[in-house]
Every structure is written in C-alpha cells, then in structure tokens.
Amino acid sequence: MTRDFDMLSALQMVQDITAEAGLIALGMFGQVEGHEKDDGTLVTEADRRVEQYIRKRILDQYPHHMVFGEEDGSGGMEQSPFLWLLDPIDGTNNFASGVPIWGISVGLFYKGKPFLGVLHMPCLDQTFWASDGEGAYCDGTRVSVRRTDTLARNDLLLISSPNIPHWDFSAQVKYRITGSTAYSMALVAAGNAVGTVCNHWYVWDVGASMVLLKEVGALVTDIHGQSLFDLENRDYRAPGPCMVAASPECHALLMQHVKTS
C-alpha cells in the first residue's frame, strides 16, 4: 500500500543516489569509449557502473520492489506494484563524445502510474525532481509548463531526430535536438520549450521525466492522442511509439502538425 511508503524519505534517497552516481560518471567523462549494442545504441563502462551502483542502493532499501534498467534488465520482485526505471546515462552518445548534455534518470511507478522521479544533470549542475501530488521542481524552484494558444516562430520544439515520419516540419518553430530524451522532457516540464516530439524511446528513458510532466499537468501521448502515462502491461524492452509531450494548450497546437498515416 502507498500509505506504508515514505515518499519524502524515498525522494531524498534518490536525490542522494543520483548525486553520488553523478560523481562516478563525471570521473569517467571524456575517458571512456562507447560500444554499439545489438539495438544500435551506444553503451560505455560508465553506463554499467552507474546502473550497478543505483540498482544496488535501491534494492538494499527496497528489496521487495522491482527494478528495471537499460543495461541489466529486471531485478528484485517482478510482481511488485512498485517499479523503478533506471537510465544510468541518458544521452550516452553525448557522454561518449564529451558533450556535457547527459543525465542520470531514476523514476518510480506505482501500479503502472508515474509516482516519483529524479533527473540529475551532473555537468550542468542541475537536478529536476517530482513526486505524486507535490509538483515538479528544478534545483528547489517549482516549475510549470508553457501554456499558450499560439506557436511563435521563436518557440523551441525539442525533437529526437531530424527525421520523424509522423511530424510535419512545416510548423513555424525553432527545432532543437538535445541528445537526451529525459532532458528534453524535463525542459518541457520547466517551460523552456513548448513541447517535444520523440520517435524513438524506451521506458527507462522517460521514467523520471514522465513524473515531472504529470505533475505540471502536461499531456504525453502517441500520435493518436492516447495517453502514454500508464506503463502497465507494456513490454519494457520494446521501443515506445512516437511521443508528443506538451501542456494541453500546446499539445493541441502540436497535434495539428502530426501525420497519422
């Protein structure tokens, strides 16, 4: 039962863990090479070490919870209603190339719903966090999503790739690619961008940022407008569908530029 779960204690623990994991990763930043996995994505020794550290710390505290990470898959009790999603380094290509836009993402879902999340960006010295019913924050300041009834030429739209089959690039906005799905979503939650469109993601990428977006009242949907907040019954190893995330107002505007066929 969630009433037996100490949210404040868990949030503090995850903030501490991600900060400590950030120091591990920073010690290897610019010193490790990436190797291509079977799915075509990169992995470094830093990814593995950071995930092992976070996984152990969480399971030491919550041995009856389930943990699912990008590198080592599932651990703990698979039937638990509590699911921790770990991305040890979101933005591995950036990390391996010496680009400082990468983060450590830890999200907790309860019965498939976003519950608690922390995204720590070590090089930027920036931390986002959110918990169920308590709002979303960046470095202690509460954040809010952009709400507007028009898209302006200088508004930032964060995309995962310059080639998104379901997106009409005639939309008059400024397109940017951060190289980190989690960070792009966090920037939307913080109001720095009007939205994000991502056509290639996995549950571990979005674990923390889904909580951020839920807490600021944003929508996260597929191209048909179906909510993606509920992870229950998902295949955690399968890539997610093309995602559109924004405030309800901006989401409606962005959906006008989505191609569903």
Each model region followed by its residue ranges:
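DPxDG-like acidic metal-binding loop motif
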Residues: 78-139
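Residue-level signal for inorganic ion chemistry
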Residues: 25, 47, 58, 92, ...
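Short loop/edge segments at beta-strand edges and connector loops
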Residues: 69-71, 140, 179
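Generic detector of well-ordered alpha-helical packing
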Residues: 48, 71, 88-91, 122, ...
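An extended, acidic
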Residues: 145-261
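N-terminal subdomain of lithium-sensitive/metallo-dependent phosphomonoesterases centered on the IMPase/IPPase/PAP
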Residues: 1-89, 256-259
